[in-house]
Each structure stands twice: as C-alpha cells, then as structure tokens.
Amino acid sequence: MTENYTEGMFYYKVEVLRIVDGDTVDVRIDLGFNVWHKCRVRLVGINAPESRTRDLEEKKRGLAAKQWLIDRLEFHDVEMQSHGTGKYGRVLGELFVEGVNINQLMVEKGHATEYDGGKR
C-alpha cells in the first residue's frame, strides 16, 4: 500500500454513497468542473472478512469490519488514490480521511488482511 504520493496515481475527492462490505464501497468521484462519476471501489491491498456468507463466525467479523469502515468514513471528507481497475473491472483505490490511509488502518486494527489480488 502507498503512504505518500505515487507517480501515475490520481487523487480524487469522493462522496461515499454506501459501504458494501469491509473492502468495497460505492462512491461518487469528483472529477472537477462539476463532473462526478459514480462507481464501486474495491479497497486495494486488503481483504476483509465476508459479511454475506453462511459461515457465522466470518459473517460476524465481516459485519464488524463493515461497521468499523462506516464509523471512519461517515460524516468525513474522504479522498481516494486510484490504482486503476482490478480483474473484475472494479476501480481499485485507497481511501484517506484527514491524511490517514484507511486501507492500512483496517489492517492495523485487525479488520482486514493484506491482499495482493491473488487467491484468498
């Protein structure tokens, strides 16, 4: 994951519309000049437990990760650093609140594990 500016990556202000789960959010990206783009963003570099599963223990951890993310993003100004698109066509991004890398913080707080895009 990236802590500082990385060449070739773009930063955007985003409006979080919905937290899908602990590693996926729906946002509106401010492209500037009053142009917005709505999309689903997969948080790059992390994997959170599934919140929609029959495994009750994983579901419990997944719902906790989702709630933790809601608590960190709701009512805050959020920025996103784009990392292109992933293998399923979703935008990949890192989220920041007041300069804090939320993706990284999720791993540090135990709500997600590091993930490089391979098999889980």
What are these regions (language model features)?
Residues 1-120:
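Small beta-barrel nucleic-acid-binding modules, primarily SNase/OB-fold domains
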